[in-house]
Amino acid sequence: MNMNSLSVSRVLADLAGKDFISCSDFTSDQVKALLQLSSQLKNGDRRIDLGNRVLGLIFSKASTRTRVSFQVAMARLGGQTIDLSNQATQLARGEPLKDTARVLSRYCDALALRTFGNDELIEYAKWSSIPVINALTDLEHPCQALADFLTIKEAFGSLDGITLAYIGDGNNVLNSLMICGTLLGVNIQIASPKGFEPLPSIVERAKTLAHPTLKICVSNNPIDAVSGAHVIYTDVWASMGQESEQAQRKEIFEGYTVNKDLVDKAEKESIILHCLPAHRGEEITDDVLESSASRIFDQAENRLHVQQALLAALLGGL
């Protein structure tokens, strides 16, 4: 579905002032309109001015792509960002979160949180009177998913009939891929080692959002997962906060590396995605990451464009 600027604005009008905790907060049409707006902004077909509005960044985890893309997105939209990490505020000295959230709502126009616990994000959303954006928690990474599906749409021209294979840990990135993918009509085929599959509750939640003809398949076999896949997606085997498990996970995930042999078993014109940072030689080989099938750096760039679109919608800039 391609919409003109007026149609996009109409579909996204109801998002002004809302939180973005998960892609399931939006309708299928709203997610599609966000991707369309992202393309318009990327191609220079749309100009938006947020008029010096301020985005507060509360990041408890290290970040390159998420932090910088939000900073650049606000700058390009005529706004600005400020760093509000917990250690830089009175939260570090015990001020209740609900007090901090209400005060920040008087100074900022939106907050983007990157935190270990999803509960903290929900608490900010509860007490803030401005939009709260999920910039990554242990449960979901919805901004990443938006960028992923924009990249897939660019590669194939449409998301209709697309099958995405995810190889690796059933983590927060996969959770958002399932939820966003089902809203967009994408089939998801997953291969994870036993004990590292995605949360059944998230799988069921995604299935409730899906059209009856869509499928979400979970297995322990990477070859089964890539069969018929147009997209092969992987991520690190040990996420932030799991560094102590890295050696153990490296043994468990042996056989789940995205290498040329595995890629050759997917559709002929399949593409490769990874949200980065990558551990080359572990979840993905260097030759695959650098191959002509890789859209990994397009994917990283698209974080900027989808977050511009998201900020414009939530801050009422349309």
From Swiss-Prot:
InterPro entries: Asp/Orn_carbamoyltranf_P-bd (IPR006132), Asp/Orn_carbamoylTrfase (IPR006130), Asp/Orn_carbamoylTrfase_sf (IPR036901), Asp_carbamoyltransf_Asp/Orn-bd (IPR006131), Orn/put_carbamltrans (IPR002292), OTCase_ArgI (IPR024904). The keyword Cytoplasm applies. It is found in: Cytoplasm. It catalyses: carbamoyl phosphate + L-ornithine = L-citrulline + phosphate + H(+). Carbamoyl phosphate binds at residues 63-66, 90, 114, 141-144, 275-276, 303. GO terms for cellular component: cytoplasm. The keyword Secreted does not apply. Its EC number is 2.1.3.3. One of its GO terms (molecular function) is amino acid binding. Keywords: Amino-acid biosynthesis, Arginine biosynthesis, Cytoplasm, Transferase. GO terms for biological process: arginine biosynthetic process via ornithine; citrulline biosynthetic process; L-arginine biosynthetic process. Reversibly catalyzes the transfer of the carbamoyl group from carbamoyl phosphate (CP) to the N(epsilon) atom of ornithine (ORN) to produce L-citrulline. PANTHER family: ORNITHINE CARBAMOYLTRANSFERASE, MITOCHONDRIAL (PTHR45753), ORNITHINE TRANSCARBAMYLASE, MITOCHONDRIAL (PTHR45753:SF3). Belongs to the aspartate/ornithine carbamoyltransferase superfamily. OTCase family. This is Ornithine carbamoyltransferase. The lineage of its organism: Bacteria, Bacillati, Cyanobacteriota, Cyanophyceae, Synechococcales. The gene is argF.
